[in-house]
Amino acid sequence: MPMFSPPMQGGLPVRALEWVRLRAAQLRNDRGAIVWMAIVAALYCGATFVRSQASDWGPDHMMILATDIAQGRVDLSSLTTINDIVTIDGRHYQAMSLLPTVPYLPLVPFEFLWPFSRWVVSAAIGISAGWLALPVARRYGPGGSATWWLASLGAFGTLLFTLTIEGNFYYLAHLEAVLLTFLLLIEWHDRRRAWLIALLIGLAALARPTLILVAVPFGLALLAESKDRVRTAVALAVPLLGAIAVTAAWDFVRFGSPTETGYGIAWIEAPLARLRDQGLFSLVHVPNNVALFLGGGFTVRETFPWLEPSSLGHSILLTTPAVLIAFAASLRDRLNQILWASVILTAIPVFLFYGGGGAATYGYRYEMDFVPFLFALVAIALKDRFGNLEKILIGLSVVFVVYGYVWQVYK
């Protein structure tokens, strides 16, 4: 393929088609990537199929909402759950961000897909995110065999795998956020286009609102290195403000206020309601959340599988201990400072939130807001050292996550 391609003629569809053609040509020459994509797709699809056989089938909550939206309404015509539901004037609304509903919209005309839409959508988003673990590893890691260890960590050693196979609309927001954050990391390494950086952050925030905070370190870094700061500021502001406007409009049409997310007024189970009464976000929740995140463990039961994780969430050290490698990344490097700032800023609302690690979830699922940044830091740290200890931590991460899969199927 020539190093420089001729200018593309025509409108946006023609340019998009040409972009796809060029990327397909690059992929054909990358056998490693093709094999990686096949492995991820096969293992994710196989695990999803097995998990689906151990679950009840029926109408999918987000599929119902997508069909209702296609008919011009934003309330739910029928309910599969009463959790996180806001009832106003006899109408029922799901207290949730917008983006998890969007992948269901293309399936609305195909009624035969509705019963298993949750498996299809989650698998498609999760597999795409798993594929991107390889290009992120290639860009941030030391290369060589470490690339494949890192890619395996990203796709099979984090909660990305266990959240994907559940086919749960709550988890879909995390899958979308990981996918978009990986794209953000790739764009940051490659071209650093301010408008695209902001667009990816804005879209990620439409899945997980906490991620809007990473606009601060990434935006400041772009402004610091820009020769035209006004233009860069505008390029950053437009997509971010657009995402905020979409969120505000979505809240307004459902709850009558652009600042009402619904989480503070939705019906939830009594134990969670008591926690929420202390504050949707509050310092009161921090000690318990941090204790779960760092120290939550397993209990032993008499039947297989014998190790039972807490339904409130358990330690990241018992799901993805390889994140410890990230602490070896030097804080003197500008990139590492941006990544650590992103980790800290997204972790703050996670630990202030009343919901713990995410009810009835293997691991601490809210950690997935910042795990992609830790993943990049792990890759960077491996440039200085990639020995037996690092391999053991990555291997343990995969083992713990695979156990999570076993638990979800046989619990």
Model feature map: region roles:
Residues 1-411:
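Membrane-proximal envelope and lipid/glycan-remodeling enzymes
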